Swiss-Prot record:
Belongs to the UPF0246 family. The lineage of its organism: Bacteria, Pseudomonadati, Pseudomonadota, Alphaproteobacteria, Rhodobacterales. This is UPF0246 protein RSKD131_2757. It comes from Cereibacter sphaeroides (strain KD131 / KCTC 12085). NCBIfam families: PRK02101.1-3. GO terms for biological process: response to hydroperoxide. InterPro entries: YaaA. Signal peptide: none annotated.
C-alpha cells in the first residue's frame, strides 16, 4: 500500500526532525525537473507570483528571493516532513513517529509537490511556494499539470514496483491528485472521505479533513497496512468508519460536529 499527501502552504520557521542513526535524509528523485522549474520561476516578478498564486506582496517578494537563490542555497534544504507545517502535517505528526514507522513512511508515503513532483518524507527540499494549480508556462505547456504530464504517475508506479504495493490510498486534495495521470497510473486508487455531521447535515470541514488525511497516513505507516479493509479501523480525530455511506473506492469516515 502506498499513500499520497498534498504538501503544505505553511512552512516551519525552524524545521527540525530527529532521525535514528540508520535513517538519513534523502534527495528528491525528480530534482532535475525541480531545478528546471526553479529556473523558469526565477524569471518571475513579485507581481507575477501574486497574480499566479493569489498571494500577498510580502509572500511574493519572499518567494522571488527564494527562487533567485534556489540553485545556490541547496544547503538550506531539509526533510519535507520537517518543513511542511500545515494541518495535514499536524495530523501526520512525523516528529513523534517511532523509528520503525518513519522507515516505513519513507518507503510508502508519497508527497505530491508542484515544484518537486513526488517526494519521500525525508527528501531534502528548499523553502518555496509553487502550488500545483499554478498556470506557469514551460516548454511542456501552460500549467504545472502540463509540465508534469505522466511523470508523477510513473514515479508512483516505480515506488509501487519497489515496495510491492498493490493499491494507492489518496489522502491528497483534488488539486494535487489531478497531477497523477490516472491513465498512466497502474494502481487502483482508494480515496478516504472525512465528513462531519452537524445539525443533521454531513459535510467536509476542511480543517478537520486535512488533519484526518495526515492522521490516516500516520495510521497506515504505524500499522504497516497493506489490506485496504484495515483502513476501516481508523479512529483518529473522532472519526469512525461509516459503512452505509462507503464504497470500496471511497470509504467514508464520520465525526460528530
Amino acid at each position: 500500500m502506498l499513500a499520497v499527501l498534498s504538501p503544505a502552504k505553511r512552512l516551519a520557521a525552524r524545521p527540525a526532525l530527529d532521525l535514528p542513526a540508520d535513517l538519513a535524509p534523502s534527495e528528491p528523485r525528480l530534482q532535475d525537473q525541480a531545478d528546471a522549474l526553479a529556473r523558469v520561476a526565477r524569471d518571475l516578478t513579485a507581481a507575477d507570483l501574486r497574480r499566479l498564486m493569489h498571494i500577498s506582496e510580502p509572500l511574493a517578494r519572499l518567494n522571488v528571493a527564494r527562487f533567485a537563490e534556489f540553485h545556490e542555497a541547496r544547503n538550506a534544504a531539509v526533510p519535507a516532513v520537517a518543513l511542511f507545517d500545515g494541518d495535514t502535517y499536524a495530523g501526520l505528526e512525523a516528529r513523534t513517529m517511532d523509528a520503525d514507522a518513519l522507515r516505513w513512511a519513507q518507503e510508502r508515503i508519497c508527497i505530491l509537490s508542484g515544484l518537486y513532483g513526488l517526494l519521500r518524507p525525508l527528501d531534502r527540499i528548499q523553502p518555496h511556494r509553487l502550488e500545483m494549480g499554478t498556470r506557469l508556462a514551460t516548454e511542456r505547456g501552460v500549467t504545472l499539470y502540463d509540465f508534469w504530464g505522466d511523470r508523477i504517475a510513473e514515479a508512483l508506479n516505480t515506488r509501487a514496483a519497489e515496495t510491492g504495493a498493490r493499491v494507492l490510498v489518496n489522502c491528497a486534495s483534488v488539486e494535487y491528485f489531478t497531477a497523477a495521470d490516472r491513465a498512466a497510473l497502474k494502481l487502483p486508487v482508494i480515496t478516504p472521505t472525512f465528513l462531519e455531521e452537524r445539525n443533521g447535515e454531513r459535510k467536509i470541514v476542511s480543517f478537520w479533513a486535512k488533519r484526518a488525511r495526515g492522521a490516516m497516513a500516520r495510521f497506515i505507516a504505524e500499522n504497516r497496512l497493506n489490506d485496504p479493509a484495515d483502513l476501516r479501523a481508523f479512529r483518529a480525530g473522532g472519526y469512525a468508519y461509516e459503512p452505509d455511506l462507503s464504497t470500496d473506492e471511497r470509504p467514508v469516515f464520520l465525526r460528530a460536529g
